């Protein structure tokens, strides 16, 4: 089964990581993410993942009564913000939680684990 790991932090890294070189050398609060990536990528667990840009670069899109409404910024204004995500394939929620617990950001941020749900088919 596929699971989404939402990688959340309370504050963005300072300065924000924007260039490919900065992202490639990212050291998470003294915790190098490369060993975790090697484990989950090498084990065929992680299907895809990425960091995402800071909340100030977000746009929120709604359609109400046929009209598109675009707002600058994220959907919710909170201290926590999504810094990235990973899509993993595991046998169970328990295994997905174990993988999330080993993510370096779990030591100072949080990892929300959500199972994928199939879309209804005609």
What are these regions (language model features)?
Residues 1-122:
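Conserved, structured core segments of small domains
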């Amino acid at each position: 089964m596929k699971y989404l790991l939402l990688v959340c932090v309370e504050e963005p890294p300072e300065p924000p990581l924007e260039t490919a070189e900065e992202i490639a050398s990212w050291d998470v609060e003294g915790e190098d993410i490369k060993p975790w990536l090697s484990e989950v990528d090498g084990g065929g667990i992680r299907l895809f993942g990425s960091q995402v840009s800071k909340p100030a670069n977000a746009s929120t899109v709604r359609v109400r009564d046929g009209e598109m409404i675009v707002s600058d910024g994220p959907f919710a204004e909170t201290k926590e913000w999504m810094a990235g995500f990973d899509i993993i394939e595991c046998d169970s929620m328990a295994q997905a939680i174990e993988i999330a617990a080993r993510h370096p950001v779990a030591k100072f941020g949080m990892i929300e684990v959500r199972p994928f749900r199939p879309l209804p088919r005609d």
